[in-house]
Amino acid sequence: MTDTLLPAAPQPLEKEGNCYFRKGCNPLAQTGRSKLQNQRAALNQQILKAMRMRTGAENLLKAATNQKVREQVRLELSFLNSDLQMLKEELEGLNISVGVYQNTEEAFTIPLIPLGLKETKDVDFSVALKDFILEHYSEDSYLYEDEIADLMDLRQACRTPSRNEAGVELLMSYFMQLGFVESRFFPPTRQMGILFTWYDSLTGVPVSQQNLLLEKASILFNIGALYTQIGTRCNRQTEAGLESTVDAFQRAAGVLNYLKETFTHTPSYDMSPAMLSVLVKMMLAQAQESTFEKVCLPGLQNEFFLLVKVAQEAAKVGEVYRQLHTAMNQEPVKENIPYSWASLACVKAHHYEALAHYFTATLLIDHQLKPGEDEDHQEKCLSQLYSHMPEGLTPLATLKNVHQRQLLGKSHLCQAVTHHEESMREASLCKKLRNIDVLQEVLSAAHDRSQLKYTQLREDDDLLNLTDAPDIVSKTEREVEIIVPQFSKVTVTDFFQKLGPLSVFSANKRWTAPRSIHFTAEEGDLGFTLRGNSPVQVHFLDPYCSAAAAGTKEGDYIVSIQDVDCKWLTLSEVMKMLKSFGQDDIEMKVVSLLDATSTMHSKCATYSVGMQKTYSMICLGIDVDDKTDKTKKVSKKLSFLSWGTNKNRQKSASTLCLPSVGVTMPPVKKKLSSPFSLLNTDSSLY
């Protein structure tokens, strides 16, 4: 006899005052960041439409045999390619819109580059999860409508996270919740029929898969992107703000590096291993730049040892940006990295190399070795400043000879002016960088300062006497490093914990439907012993006891006693409950573990518009009928994202039948419709 398991008196998941429900930002707020994200969503749709039209035109060109038709199609293809190029340039403009994310109090600092959040489409979990709960766990799916709707609300809230630690915790909580969902509802032998669609943040190309790994990888990318936006928002005019900036970019690098190492075959350009490696380098370069700004924040005194330190710190920043620019110009990254990003990396490389030469020139020209000063220390610092001294010069002789110091200092000034001019030229070649006023002002001011100092010292025979300035050895007191994400610090409650302990009740294990066992304890003896802990398992069963006669088997798991859910009860609690009935009849429900059948894994197709080469995830292929009926609950609670129009979320009916015998469904409680609802759009509002 089989029954449907009805969890009696389930423990509520709601924790009032414990931040169980989290909200995203108001998608209707017309902030600069929300407008930018709305433009990104609109551009994604335009790019998708243009790519579909181009694909259709290419197919028509292959199929057409009429020469006149082929010429018309070629003309249309040229227009479509032109439109796509313009759309990609618009998307690049959004990716370099650094002014929106910068702190408003910053007046004279070079902007940092944040990453934009990946966009997605709405996903309906309800039908697939309800079917799986009925089929796999043999439980009534209506009991889990609240939990399914909570999961969908949490996903919707993650589309508009706030730009602070609360937003990071929101994304991390959903990422960890996906781990629970994957273990409970995504078996390794089949697909669930839930299609996840995410847009590439750099190209706008959509990627769709029936694979939860795409969802998890995209959420990780957005966590890293959110850290970059937090870093650019910090006030870099204060020491605490700069420290927060360094920390945020190090954490962003850690998340992106974790994504690269964990999800190695992601089907999106922005999450490919090569692109992620470049993005990690960019985050660390910006963290190193903020470290240099922190050194310079108190003001630079015209002191020998301090100038040596600052020169080497600037050389370090220039070095990491030079390496970043080289990485951005390698295939296959070069094709998809925004040109303005690569240009800005080159600009910063020249700018900070120029600063290193300027500070070196200052310490050589403005200082002389005086009696009583630490001669050995200055000699050591100067020797460590260069990998090798210019031919014919020694550190100590240079310190003592004013003329040699002047000549070497002017050589560094010439080199500084050259790098400044190159940085300004590179910035002028990029239309997006020309529109960043603060960048132009900083580059111009630095160039004028070096040019003025050289003009004051220039002599007619400098072209004959000056030698090439040696390269400055890069050195930093604080080497920035990747901070590994710590997901364990975010406390998450499994939405579907009523299904039982995850170690036992998971998608990887197949179970029989619950069987009702009616028996009595003869003279206080149950006829079996118990073992295990949450859930309790039948052990050492007496084949002649009443429980065995009623159908109990050794190894069965006890899931309920007298309609009281026992999946989370300990052995002592279950034994105490059984003993409490004495000689009375006991109704116990048990389930048995079925042998797992091995299934050969197959690859599923990745739908990616316009991607000639794609990284394909391994997932499992079966035919799944399209489910178009979107279902949502009428929640007793406010949704995670409680802005929008008044639309009630309707409950959906499952497509599977309950394996129940003589079980009466309890009356459905009437729920009050929420005055708020999620905005249901194809692209997220931000």
Swiss-Prot record:
The keyword Lipid biosynthesis does not apply. This is Rhophilin-2. It comes from the Eukaryota. Interacts with GTP-bound RhoA and RhoB. Interacts with both GTP- and GDP-bound RhoA. Interacts with KRT18. The keyword Zinc-finger does not apply. Binds specifically to GTP-Rho. May function in a Rho pathway to limit stress fiber formation and/or increase the turnover of F-actin structures in the absence of high levels of RhoA activity. GO terms for biological process: glomerular filtration; negative regulation of stress fiber assembly; signal transduction. It is found in: Cytoplasm, Perinuclear region. Residues 46-66 are annotated as: Interaction with Rho. SUPFAM superfamilies: HR1 repeat, PDZ domain-like. Residues 111-460 form the BRO1 domain. Gene3D superfamilies: 2.30.42.10, alix/aip1 like domains, HR1 repeat. Residues 26-100 form the REM-1 domain. Residues 515-593 form the PDZ domain. Belongs to the RHPN family. One of its GO terms (cellular component) is plasma membrane. The gene is RHPN2. The modification Phosphothreonine is found at residue 655. Disulfide bonds: none annotated. It comes from Bos taurus (Bovine). Keywords: Coiled coil, Cytoplasm, Phosphoprotein.
